[in-house]
UniProtKB/Swiss-Prot annotation:
Pathways per UniProt: Cofactor biosynthesis; adenosylcobalamin biosynthesis
Protein name: Cobyric acid synthase
Keywords, comma-separated and alphabetical: Cobalamin biosynthesis, Glutamine amidotransferase
GO terms of biological process kind: cobalamin biosynthetic process
CDD domains: CobQ_N, GATase1_CobQ
Pfam families: CbiA, GATase_3
PROSITE patterns: GATASE_COBBQ
Family: Belongs to the CobB/CobQ family. CobQ subfamily.
Length: 483
């Protein structure tokens, strides 16, 4: 049983993607492999089979390893709820919120959870494929580190260092990162991977030769830049769109400061008949067929932000002209009359008026609802599956006209009597082809092409494994995996 860790010279160097690729590459060879990220900071999360939540990148990596997501795959998840603080989730459950200084002192406790999860995974699988966080060379974060070299040293595992050449300065990134590590950590780095290369590899070869001579460490391979790879983004919103046909449905999503689970919109971004626009601060909401209010980690704060940009008036105007509005999770709560936070779970305790578009109120409670669900939309009785991650309890007469009837007997969300407004707690509802098509028809698209988002993701995972096979030193990788 062995552990191999991927660390990056920067954020977005390609760590998540490489771990996904390696998981599928090993799984195709019959190796039992499991993804693992000691500590993740993200507002995009997934619900696990054991009823907790982990970063969505680890859920995608689990799919690559043909496993159901489990809380041991990401034992520490930090979900920012302010500029200086985060909700701390240990083994899938929210335990507290704290600022960065307090969390620094809490790391020793978090590390116990990390090591316990790693030990369980190591005893159950041939290979634990680990993803680091950010860069291991952040000097101010090295004391008490549990996400990068602190973890690697604790479990005595080899490390691969990946860097993004498309950003420029790849040799400075690799050599500089190595120089800032301690001697024992430097020895732990067993090779380099260069990511997102465009052009003739022969022109890069002198640089690779220099790097190996300078560091004494091998280049395991150079991965090409792939333009049309569409796995879920963990942090920043991916705004790339595929080629579109002429008949387009215009969908607008206002980007809120604490937007969460923006991966909800990936199926729309990839749909050939949807023109998806993310609207930022100071921008007016343009004419559209559908406005979607997204999930939020700070609903009252994001409501205030929405109003400060005049987007509440834009939503009202949109409805007057016959447009459709969809609220997802926090967006559902915003559609109601009041949002109450008596415990101060998302900031200062208090209440805020909602948009007043549906007759209900929401009270934020400490116990978070975490579950994978399936059921039927009120629209066309279309099959839908998704997941709930919310701390609010919503009550009011508008809920009598439910948006979803769940298979467990509960109803979810609400619809307006005129059919223009729909709200639901379900994340991921556009991933189910039938539900996505029904929602697009409701929003005004007539001849809807059905798109299977899960099949698209599976295709891209397979392509990643092919890249490992064709561009990396697979013999070296197998040795590092103890195979």
């Amino acid at each position: 049983m062995s552990t191999l860790m991927v660390q990056g010279t920067t954020s977005d160097a390609g760590k998540s993607t490489l771990v996904t690729a390696l998981c599928r590459w090993l799984w195709r060879q019959g190796v039992s492999v499991v993804p693992f990220k000691p500590q993740n900071m993200a507002l995009n999360s997934a619900v696990t089979a054991d009823g907790g939540e982990i970063g969505r990148a680890q859920a995608v990596q689990a799919q690559a390893a043909n496993l159901a997501p489990h809380t041991d795959m990401n034992p520490v998840l930090l979900k920012p709820n302010s500029d200086t603080g985060s909700q701390v989730i240990i083994h899938g459950r929210a335990v507290t919120s704290m600022n960065a200084v307090a969390y620094h002192d809490y790391k020793a406790i978090a590390m116990q959870a990390v090591l316990a999860s790693h030990e369980r995974l190591k005893s159950a699988y041939q290979v634990v494929m680990v993803e680091g966080a950010g860069s291991p060379a952040e000097i101010n974060l090295r004391a008490g580190d549990i996400a990068n070299m602190g973890f690697a040293e604790a479990v005595d595992c080899p490390v691969l260092l990946i860097a993004d050449i498309n950003r420029g300065g790849v040799f400075a990134h690799l050599v500089g990162t190595l120089e800032l590590l301690s001697p024992s950590e430097q020895a732990r780095v067993k090779g380099f991977i260069i990511n997102r290369f465009r052009g003739d590899l022969a022109l890069l070869q002198p640089g690779l030769d220099w790097l190996e001579a300078r560091t004494g460490k091998p280049v395991i391979g150079v991965l090409p830049y792939v333009l049309d790879l569409h796995l879920e983004a963990e942090d920043g919103i991916d705004q790339r769109q595929v080629g579109k046909v002429e008949q387009l449905l215009k969908v607008v999503v206002p980007v809120l400061p604490r937007i969460s689970n923006h991966t909800d919109f990936d199926p729309l971004r990839l749909h050939p008949q949807v023109d998806l626009q993310f609207i930022g601060p100071g921008q007016a909401i343009p004419a559209a067929d559908l406005i979607i209010l997204p999930g939020s980690k700070s609903v009252r704060g994001d409501l205030a932000y929405l109003r400060s940009n005049g987007w509440d008036r834009a939503v009202a105007r949109h409805l007057r002209y016959g447009g459709k509005v969809l609220g997802i999770c926090g967006g559902l709560q915003m559609l109601g009359e009041q949002v109450h936070d008596p415990l101060g779970l998302e900031g200062a305790a208090g209440s805020s008026p909602g948009l007043g578009l549906l007759a209900f109120e929401t009270v934020l409670e400490e116990e978070k609802q975490l579950r994978n669900v399936s059921g039927r939309l009120s629209l066309e009785n279309a099959a839908v599956s998704g997941y709930e991650i919310h701390a609010g309890v919503t009550r009011g007469p508008a809920l009598e006209l439910a948006a979803v009837q769940l298979d467990d007997g509960r109803s979810d969300g609400a619809c307006s009597a005129d059919g223009q407004i729909l709200g639901t707690y379900l994340h991921g509802l556009f991933e189910t082809p039938a539900a996505c098509s029904a929602l697009l028809r409701w929003a005004g698209l007539e001849a809807v092409q059905e798109v299977d988002y899960h099949a698209l993701r599976e295709r891209d995972i397979e392509r990643l494994a092919d890249l490992v096979e064709h561009h990396l030193d697979t013999a070296a990788l197998r040795r590092l995996c103890g195979l």
